[in-house]
Amino acid sequence: HWMHAHTLQEQLLLAAPLIVADPADDANDEQEVVILLHDFSFSSPEELLAGLQSKNTGGAMPINGMDLSGDAGGAMAGMSHGGMAMDINDIEYDANLANDRSLDDPEIVPVERGGRLRVRIINGATATAFTIDFGALEGELIAVDGQPVEPVRGRRFPMTTGQRIDVRVRLPRDLSAAFPILALREGSKERTGIVLRPAGAAVARLGTAADMDAPVIDLTLEA
């Protein structure tokens, strides 16, 4: 679970994880890792809301002083002759955060080789959906929104706003490298995340942008 404001204060990162422990999990011998995702803007929530309510932006709302003027009757970015492109992200945020940090300075989580993890991920973003990417690690989705589910194995799991997932991961015993867990912003290259690091492993620098756009969230996992 997680606790958060139900007003514009939530956009100011007024939120925190709320983990309700189940005594039945005590015998699992697994390390818990919690990741709280946020979208962050230097603009105030009131400014962001006003931009969304404006009828002149036409699409995703630029911020940071970008010029909103122009010929509204002309071609818009992302529009083809066949019609308007899908409107995925309403706000262009300044950063995406995992546990209040970007990939410029990510949280490094110490882990044991061969250990088992329960990764609890909370999408606390106000207006951003993510695909969670475990990279070379395969995980097992075991709970959604705090409720157990039939386990689903995979390396990527979609998350919409406000959603929570629990993923169980077994680390290799010969683990010699650090492994990032990334949150890929829907339909774009922006990303955030944390890094799992066994003792002695080097941590490579990760950029805040991927080489290609992340997928658009759909209902494939629920099928």
PLM region spans:
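Short, charged, solvent-exposed linker or helix-capping segments at domain edges/interfaces
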Residues: N28-E32, E46-L49, L206-A209
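Polar, glycine-rich mid-to-C-terminal structural blocks
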Residues: V33, L37, S41-A98
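A short secondary-structure junction signal
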Residues: A15, E46-L49, T131-I132
